[in-house]
């Protein structure tokens, strides 16, 4: 049975992309191509950028291209792994989120603290500060290395609108190679039919340009849409497997054309089972390989789509499978939608399909949502253990986690442990979370430290990020203490303490009596090495974007560059550039990518340039400056224009109603637009609101942070359920872990660790105070 293809490590993905593209240059570019790398003959460079046609003059194809760019921006589609936090996009299969954060903010603030996050970047569409410029007067000098920012923004905007020919004409007026390379990269990113040959030519001409997964995706899409020859397709994939649905389909067609029927069939089955794509490509696959896919393949695709709430794909797959599978889709959707007809839909599933994984999952979720976790646990106990039958073990784990926590709330630790431990999570981050939950329940509620130690050891064997490494070691120490192994416990705490920027690393340091918080930084890149770094086209392009104020487009290039770099000194230099460009969001991204790989870029990961100076309001209790930085980093990554789907705005992600109440409390005028246009105004109101929360919760940092994220009403419920962490008889570490909203649980830990680091960044004399912070407001 075909299993989902394993993805390449991020550190290798871009190099494989470049190798695959360059390896095919001899085939793809056997004929001559234009100087700019286009498929069409190149036109002589113009002395000045050519005036673009008006939008009204666009062809139908160009209009469609522009509309498609707005609907599905390739930048927003990039999954950027920046933080061991998983951004869940919905209700987490029943666990209600505290609130909805902006796409970028959710990368840090939501869900699982061990998952590499899918970090969708903000839309990189750039609106020029002025109308797209006309051709300069012929008497003016041609654009030189000092690229005109307005003209650069104009050319970028043309590519973003799908006006490739107009963009090319403007690009040809630039003489700076960095500007030309930047604009070609923008054209490829925009996905406006640039073509395979042009994409390959760009990589050939710029072998050191941070490639990223998008260049590969664009090339694979073009291989299929341009119907490239089997020889070219196979040459392209000689060094790297396909990473997209179009790429897999193109390779399957090429394999079959060359007589490799078995390999082609295997590729089609892998495509069908592991990739998400729409009706059009589905029809092409079925038309090209009518006898390859079986009912088992269709059922697998249906199950995967159901677990992703992709009802249309699931319905089509059920139709291909035949039988009564459509009833499973109806039942699954009714349960997920919390329909009043869910029970009837489940009852309508034929008895022959009630052993199907999808039915078991839906039945368990229905019972759990009906506040019957014991019955849900009994149903989960009948679930198959074969990962290929479960299809997506991670989604199954999420349901198990929610049921286990509900059972724990009922005091049934034994069953909660059974539900948590009998899991089949697939990805490392979910396996870490599952093993942690099983170990934590065993240690703190089921009285079985020996079993807990085994689970925490499994976490340690998988963990790579500082947060996960520290969490594993800290809890190994707690288990060892419970077993009476004091020396072993100390060794585990010392291991956790080696991660000083992670929450559990800081808690371990406090437990060991360590009061320092050492932040690491590499040596500077100097001399000829620094000159060579600064001279790279991609680095010069980043400077051009920064000087033109195009931060939205600079961010993905910073991230691609940070992924490609392995020398800490070069990463430090990249961060220095982001600092020069006053781009704290890029600094956070660069720093996180570095520290996730164990590289010493702690300071860059916690920038101090993101908040302008301001005078605080005196009508509310004051909070320390480090706390404002800790919150802003978690809420918006210092993006002053950030807006969430539910309306939270600005640097501090304040809801307008909350901001208005706070403004009234401090007797200042309220202007909702200033939340996103005036970062100092938003920071002042955010700090004032934090002061209000400190007052509400009598100085408790834990309760204030939880309330900032989830609201005071939820915090009151959690105090009723789990006790008051301000009282001495409640273990505050456990209290935070018992927060039922995964987003808020993670949020409190991340803000608490941010606070410790920012104290050190803003005042190097500051001692580690996390133990006191966790117990503030104690009575």
Please report, for each region that a protein language model flagged, where it lies by residue.
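Catalytic glycan-binding domains that act on GlcNAc-containing polysaccharides
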Residues: 185-187, 200-201, 205, 372-375, ...
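Residue at a conserved register position within TPR or TPR-like alpha-solenoid repeats
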Residues: 158, 223, 255, 305, ...
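Structural motif corresponding to the intra-repeat A-B loop/turn of tetratricopeptide repeats
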Residues: 161, 226-227, 258, 308, ...
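TPR repeat positional signature
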Residues: 151, 179-180, 184, 216, ...
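Structural register within alpha-helical repeat arrays
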Residues: 154, 184-187, 219, 251, ...
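Compositionally biased, proline/threonine/alanine/serine-rich low-complexity intrinsically disordered stretches
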Residues: 33-150
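Solenoid-like repeat scaffolds
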Residues: 137-145, 168-178, 188-192, 201-211, ...
């Amino acid at each position: 049975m075909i299993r989902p293809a394993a993805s390449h490590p991020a550190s290798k993905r871009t190099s494989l992309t470049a190798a695959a593209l360059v390896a095919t240059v001899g085939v793809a570019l056997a004929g001559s191509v234009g100087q700019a790398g286009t498929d069409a003959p190149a036109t002589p460079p113009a002395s000045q950028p050519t005036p673009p046609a008006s939008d009204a003059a666009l062809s139908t194809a160009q209009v469609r291209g522009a509309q498609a760019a707005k609907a599905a921006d390739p930048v927003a589609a990039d999954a950027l792994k920046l933080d061991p936090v998983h951004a869940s996009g919905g209700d987490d299969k029943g666990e209600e989120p505290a609130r909805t954060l902006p796409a970028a903010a959710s990368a840090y603030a939501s869900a699982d603290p061990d998952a590499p996050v899918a970090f969708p970047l903000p839309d990189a569409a750039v609106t020029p500060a002025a109308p797209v410029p006309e051709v300069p007067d012929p008497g003016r000098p041609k654009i030189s290395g000092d690229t005109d920012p307005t003209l650069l923004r104009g050319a970028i905007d043309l590519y973003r609108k799908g006006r490739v020919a107009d963009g090319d004409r403007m690009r040809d007026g630039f003489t700076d190679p960095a500007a030309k390379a930047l604009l070609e990269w923008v054209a490829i990113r925009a996905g406006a039919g640039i073509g395979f040959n042009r994409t390959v030519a760009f990589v050939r001409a710029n072998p050191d340009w941070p490639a990223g997964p998008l260049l590969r995706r664009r090339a694979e899409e073009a291989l299929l849409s341009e119907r490239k020859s089997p020889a070219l397709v196979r040459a392209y994939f000689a060094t790297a497997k396909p990473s997209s649905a179009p790429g897999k389909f193109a390779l399957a067609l090429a394999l079959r054309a060359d007589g490799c029927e078995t390999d082609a069939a295997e590729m089609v089955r892998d495509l069908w089972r592991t990739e998400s794509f729409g009706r059009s490509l589905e029809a092409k696959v079925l038309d090209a390989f009518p006898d390859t896919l079986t009912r088992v393949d269709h059922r697998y695709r249906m199950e995967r789509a159901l677990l992703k709430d992709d009802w249309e794909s699931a319905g089509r797959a059920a139709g291909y499978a035949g039988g009564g599978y459509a009833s499973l889709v109806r039942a699954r959707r009714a349960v997920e939608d919390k329909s009043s007809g869910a029970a009837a839909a489940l009852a309508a599933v034929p008895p022959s399909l009630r052993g199907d994984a999808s039915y078991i999952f839906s039945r368990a979720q229905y019972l759990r949502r009906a506040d019957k976790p014991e019955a849900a646990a009994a149903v989960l106990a009948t679930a198959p253990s074969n990962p290929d039958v479960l299809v997506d073990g991670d989604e199954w784990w999420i349901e198990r986690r929610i049921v286990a926590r509900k059972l724990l709330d009922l005091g049934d630790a034994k069953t909660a442990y059974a539900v948590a431990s009998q899991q089949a999570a697939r990805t490392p981050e979910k396996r870490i979370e599952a093993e942690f939950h099983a170990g934590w329940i065993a240690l703190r509620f089921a009285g079985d430290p020996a079993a807990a130690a085994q689970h925490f050891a499994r976490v340690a064997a998988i963990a790579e990020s500082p947060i996960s490494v520290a969490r594993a070691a800290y809890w190994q120490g707690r288990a060892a203490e419970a077993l009476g192994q004091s020396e072993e416990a100390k060794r585990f705490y010392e291991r956790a303490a080696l991660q000083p920027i992670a929450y559990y690393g800081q808690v371990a340091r406090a437990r060991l009596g360590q009061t320092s918080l050492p932040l690491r930084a590499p040596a500077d890149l100097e001399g000829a090495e620094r000159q060579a770094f600064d001279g790279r086209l991609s680095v010069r392009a980043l400077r051009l974007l920064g000087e033109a104020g195009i931060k939205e487009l600079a961010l993905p290039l910073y991230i691609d560059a940070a992924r490609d770099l392995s020398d800490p000194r070069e990463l430090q230099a990249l961060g220095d550039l982001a600092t020069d460009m006053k781009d704290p969001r890029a600094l956070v991204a660069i720093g996180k990518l570095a520290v996730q790989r164990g590289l010493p870029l702690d300071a860059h990961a916690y920038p101090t340039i993101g908040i302008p100076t301001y005078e605080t309001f005196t009508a509310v209790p004051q909070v320390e400056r480090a706390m404002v930085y800790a919150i802003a980093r978690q809420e918006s990554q210092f993006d002053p224009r950030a807006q969430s789907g539910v309306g939270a705005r600005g640097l501090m992600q304040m809801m307008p109603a909350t901001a208005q109440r706070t403004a009234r409390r401090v007797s200042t005028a309220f202007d909702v637009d200033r939340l996103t246009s005036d970062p100092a105004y938003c920071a002042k109101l955010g700090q004032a609101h934090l002061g209000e929360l400190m007052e509400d919760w009598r100085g408790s940092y834990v309760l204030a942070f939880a309330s900032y994220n989830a609201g005071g009403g939820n915090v009151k419920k959690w105090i009723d359920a789990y006790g008051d962490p301000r009282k001495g008889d409640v273990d505050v570490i456990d209290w935070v872990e018992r927060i039922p909203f995964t987003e808020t649980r993670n949020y409190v830990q991340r803000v608490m660790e941010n606070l410790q680091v920012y104290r050190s960044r803003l005042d190097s004399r500051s001692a580690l105070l996390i133990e006191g912070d966790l117990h503030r407001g104690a009575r």
